[in-house]
Amino acid sequence: MLTDKVAIVTGASSGIGRAAALLFAREGAAVVANARGEAELQKLVSEIEAAGGRAVAVAGDVADEGTHRALLEAALGRFGGLDIALNNAGTVGPYKPLGEVMLEEWQHALAMNLTSAFLGARLQIPAMLERGGGSIVFTSTFVGTSVGIPGMGTYGASKAGIMGLVKGITADYGARGIRANALLPGGTDTPMAGDAAQKEWAAGLHALKRIAQPEEIARAALFLASPMASFVAGSALYADGGNAAVK
């Protein structure tokens, strides 16, 4: 499905990002994988290469523009271009009412969840235009878009801003072949999901009464990244186990 494509995947050392990097590689893409931890990234690259795929690791913080430049340089220098970006890395928290959130906490959430997405897209777009277009997928969330959750207003606001970015990119570059879309997972069994009690609570938010496995969300990302979604642009794909239906 992604034969001869080149994909950047951020937040690739665990959870949704790792599952997506493995899936994209199995589908034929060369993967430029990013996370802050070098050791886990190298394990991912080794797993992809052992299965016959192509991948390279670029460690770094997505809140740093230099990380995005290094990712793009790896895509161009190692694999010759860029076709797909899954801007997936982010953070959760702080878990507190908005009236108690410190400015530094607010700024950190925006830097990790929204500004990082802008920094990536700003560099990815010109590279994709050189190839006649591409697909940019941003991982957002149902929190702040379909539902507000007490104590998660900062997280929800920082992720809800992704939709403005998606629509802006679509308006500016859709006619030139770039598709931008947001993927909105429900609760997913990742290291950020918390302990068993937190996962059980999250499961109760969804019509399916369970949380997702990372591979389930990765398949939704694959759809948006692939030619199967060739007429999907400026949209939000809820992979939320029916949360939006029962909120």
Which residue ranges define each predicted feature?
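Short, small/polar-rich loop/turn modules that mediate ligand/substrate recognition or access, typified
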Residues: 174, 179, 232-234
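Alpha-helical segment proximal to the catalytic Tyr-Lys
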Residues: 126, 145, 167, 171-172, ...
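Conserved glycine-rich cofactor-binding loop
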Residues: 6, 13-15
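Conserved glycine-rich Rossmann-like NAD(P)H-binding loop of the short-chain dehydrogenase/reductase
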Residues: 27-44
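Active-site helix of classical SDR
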Residues: 121, 158, 166
